[in-house]
Amino acid sequence: MMLFKVLVITVFCGLTVAFPLSELVSINKELQNSIIDLLNSVFDQLGSYRGTKAPLEDYTDDDLSTDSEQIMDFTPAANKQNSEFSTDVETVSSGFLEEFTENTDITVKIPLAGNPVSPTS
C-alpha cells in the first residue's frame, strides 16, 4: 500500500513538472470544448429525430422537465377486432383481460397452485 502511495505521488510530481499550470489550463479548456462540441452534435442528431432544437446552450429548464411532455394514450378500442388473434369462433380484443366468445360452450379448467386438476374425458 505504501508503494502505491509513493508511486501516485511520483506520477503526480512528474506530471506537474512536465505540464506547467498554463498548459494544464489550456488542455482542460480544449477538453471541455471538445466534450461540449460532441454533446451538441449528439443533441443535434437526436433533435432531428424529435424535431426540436437540440444544442446544449439552447435548452432551458422548461425543455428538460417531464411535465411538458405529451402523454400518449395506448388504451385499445373496446370492440376493435384484432385479425391476428381472431377466428370465426372466438374474438379476442387487444386488451389482455377482455375476451369475447361466441358460438362456443368450451370450459377450460385452470389449476391453481397446489390444486391439481385431473383430466376428465
Curated annotation (Swiss-Prot):
- Which InterPro entries does this one have? KAR_prot
Q: What is its main location?
A: secreted
Instruction: Output a single Gene Ontology CC term carried by this record.
Output: extracellular region
> What does its record list under induction?
By androgens.
Q: What are the UniProt keywords, alphabetically?
A: Secreted, Signal
Question: What are the subcellular locations of this protein?
Answer: Secreted
TM segment ranges:
none
Q: Which residues form the signal peptide?
A: 1-18
Q: In which tissues is it expressed?
A: Kidney, submaxillary gland, urine.
Taxonomy, superkingdom: Eukaryota
Indicate what this protein is called per its UniProt record: Kidney androgen-regulated protein
Record the organism.
Answer: Mus musculus (Mouse)
Source organism phylogeny: Eukaryota, Metazoa, Chordata, Craniata, Vertebrata
